[in-house]
Amino acid sequence: MTQALQALIDQAWEDRTSLSPKSAPNDIREAVANVIGQLDAGTLRVAEKQGKDWIVNQWVKKAVLLSFRLEDNAPMSAGGFAQFYDKVPTKFANWSGDDFAKAGFRVVPPAVARRGSFIAKNAVLMPSYVNIGAYVDEGTMVDTWATVGSCAQIGKNVHLSGGVGIGGVLEPLQANPVIIEDNCFIGARSEVVEGVIVEENSVISMGVYLGQSTKIYDRETGEIHYGRVPAGSVVVAGNLPSKDGKYSLYCAVIVKKVDAQTRAKTSLNDLLRGD
């Protein structure tokens, strides 16, 4: 089933310039709708960890992009207090109280999640935004005005602080999604974009910006990482001097490994999660 679905999506991707809401064949529509439905239910993911490596299902990302070719914009109501005009419906548009109870997470108004995103049990969405294809795992808090970009993968027991930006893959087009692994803390107003991976148990301080070209300097070893924060790192904003010493450029600095003191400052509050 999955192989046939993948083959259909891959072929549709090759023919994408000829697709439109009026011309798309039914089998393509059904295939894309199938993928979006599975993403919404959490039974399919854009990226999955196999062993120590993350494997990106590029065909799933293609299906997300194709969905924008297959739908016209349409008016959408948000509880009668706001109107939107978009191609992608909101995740909770037709949910009942029973649906929310079964899903087991909290949504604080006016948080928005698009259909095709997945939110796991005991997660908390403060007034925030979760885009299509994103996966937010158990016990994670998406704090006020944080954004989880398209196809981003957020692990278990993660805290995305106020105003955090997690980049997406749709525009500008990125090869791989941003991945925040389990038990990470991302400080207020930090940005993680361009497919950067923050490995498990790491703490990113307030106001740190991470992209593929950002130097991530380990002050203990002198090593410089790109596109990956090693597991258990505590990272702050900093700068490194140029070779000629005339100027310095922004970087992120690994100042230490997570210890008990760090954990005490960034621990999650169980009172905010669960039933």
From Swiss-Prot:
Its EC number is 2.3.1.117. GO terms for biological process: diaminopimelate biosynthetic process; lysine biosynthetic process via diaminopimelate. Pfam families: Hexapep_2 (PF14602), THDPS_N_2 (PF14805). Pathway: Amino-acid biosynthesis; L-lysine biosynthesis via DAP pathway; LL-2,6-diaminopimelate from (S)-tetrahydrodipicolinate (succinylase route): step 1/3. It is found in: Cytoplasm. Keywords: Acyltransferase, Amino-acid biosynthesis, Cytoplasm, Diaminopimelate biosynthesis, Lysine biosynthesis, Repeat, Transferase. It catalyses: (S)-2,3,4,5-tetrahydrodipicolinate + succinyl-CoA + H2O = (S)-2-succinylamino-6-oxoheptanedioate + CoA. Gene3D superfamilies: Hexapeptide repeat proteins, Tetrahydrodipicolinate-N-succinyltransferase, N-terminal domain. CDD domains: LbH_THP_succinylT (cd03350). Belongs to the transferase hexapeptide repeat family. This is 2,3,4,5-tetrahydropyridine-2,6-dicarboxylate N-succinyltransferase. It comes from Cupriavidus taiwanensis (strain DSM 17343 / BCRC 17206 / CCUG 44338 / CIP 107171 / LMG 19424 / R1) (Ralstonia taiwanensis (strain LMG 19424)).
